[in-house]
Amino acid sequence: MLDFFKKSKSKKFKKIQLPNFNKAVDDRFPKNKWNVINQRPDVIIFEGWCVGARAETNKTLKKSINSMEKANDQKLIWRRFVNQQLKTKYKKLYSQLNCMIYLKAKNFSLLQKWRLKQEHKLWLKTKKKGAHKIMSKGDVINFMQTYQRITQNMFKKMPKYASIILNLNSNHQIKTAVYKSK
């Protein structure tokens, strides 16, 4: 993405291929299905579950927050690695953003519910095609535990850093919006 941002800002803009993600197989589509951008964009919307996430203090990493961390990361290897990535590579990436819009759900369990619904819809859409990696309920819960720490940290920190906070209700609708001036 850093390369994409660099190319998109270049005065000597050349066309850019932008990867397209295929959630059904948990990987990118083949290059022939990628988007081609032929002229420099005026606006880029870069979205993702943990876009804008910030590192935690080393002290907060010590306490396990779910069963996955308790069972599989007793020595904090994964937590420290992720935190280091947030302090370095992702901080550099997020510095490219001019405005941060945070879509804030009520809590983590609501996000799990939404993800389960999303997987079910994906299964309905792809069940006849055969090639898919649709997750079971247990798979979704395990998968989401790997992002739980980052997500809960975002619940606390993003309202301080985001330019716009859109508080969502349980039906994905905007309940309230907070606009902050710089």
Placement of each model-derived feature along the sequence:
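Conserved nucleotide-sensing/catalytic segment adjacent to the nucleotide-binding pocket
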Residues: M1-F29
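Glycine-rich phosphate/ribose-binding loops and adjacent secondary-structure elements
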Residues: F29-N38
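Short gly/ser/thr-rich secondary-structure transition/capping motifs
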Residues: K23-P30, R80-L86
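A short, aliphatic-rich alpha-helical micro-motif
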Residues: N38-Q39, Y94
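Loop/turn-to-beta-strand initiation segments
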Residues: F13-K14, R40-I44, C99
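Generic detection of short hydrophobic beta-strand segments and adjacent strand-loop junctions
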Residues: F13-L18, I37-N38, L166
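Conserved NTP phosphate-binding and transfer environment spanning the P-loop NTPase/kinase superfamily
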Residues: C50-K182
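Switch II (G3) loop of P-loop NTPases
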Residues: I44-C50
